[in-house]
């Protein structure tokens, strides 16, 4: 039986995560938020983004080699079968990975895909390929390598500097675009769906506030 999320050495996944850990830092996350905060790169329809994304290969995922558009339609269809009356959830399934359009703006794979994690505090051992994190420029910085780091207990996930990629980019697009009807619940599912160290690994609970416990149940 195939095991999902089985990460092996000497694979495209390991190479991508190594590059991610070498480059995703507190300063990088700040710079990416600043770089994309104006959302002035392009204007595209959902169908156009889905087509463009088929030119992108997600080398972080060991479980599927399907074109991105097929993955999007399959996800939406599976949700429709299980929740036929929940249109918001179906739309969320369709668009959840559209932030991968970042590759079209020249971003390398390591800044587009992969599990997300928090910069500016201790890096938990449940992170994929944890042993390669020692080469992260922030790893030995005493300001960033304590349990709380630069944050306060219970500050809320939205106060954390999470590694920047397709989830955060799409969340910011939705947050600044008032022409959609998705509620904050489904926007948060998009924002945190790759945050595996948190929702699956049990890390970062110390930072959660009351609303984050609701988000965790939703995810």
What are these regions (language model features)?
Residues 34-70, 150-157:
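Active-site flanking loop/helix segments enriched in acidic
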Residues 64-219:
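Divalent metal-dependent catalytic cores for phosphoryl transfer on phosphate-bearing substrates
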């Amino acid at each position: 039986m195939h095991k999902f999320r089985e990460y092996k050495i000497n694979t495209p996944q390991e190479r991508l995560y190594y590059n991610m850990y070498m480059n995703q830092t507190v300063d990088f996350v700040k710079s990416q938020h600043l770089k994309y905060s104006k959302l002035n790169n392009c204007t595209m329809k959902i169908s156009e983004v889905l087509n463009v994304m088929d030119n992108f290969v997600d080398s972080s995922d060991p479980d599927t080699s399907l074109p991105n558009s097929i993955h999007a339609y399959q996800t939406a269809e599976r949700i429709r079968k299980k929740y036929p009356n929940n249109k918001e959830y179906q739309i969320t399934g369709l668009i959840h990975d559209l932030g991968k359009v970042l590759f079209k703006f020249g971003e390398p794979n390591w800044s587009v895909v992969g599990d997300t994690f928090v910069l500016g505090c201790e890096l938990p051992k449940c992170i994929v390929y944890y042993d390669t994190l020692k080469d992260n420029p922030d790893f030995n910085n005493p300001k960033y390598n304590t349990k709380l780091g630069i944050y306060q207990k219970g500050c809320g996930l939205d106060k954390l500097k999470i590694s920047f990629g397709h989830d955060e980019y799409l969340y910011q697009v939705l947050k600044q675009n008032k022409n959609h009807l998705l509620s904050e619940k489904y926007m948060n599912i998009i924002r945190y769906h790759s945050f595996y160290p948190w929702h699956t690994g049990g890390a970062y609970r110390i930072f959660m506030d009351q609303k984050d416990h609701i988000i965790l149940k939703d995810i």
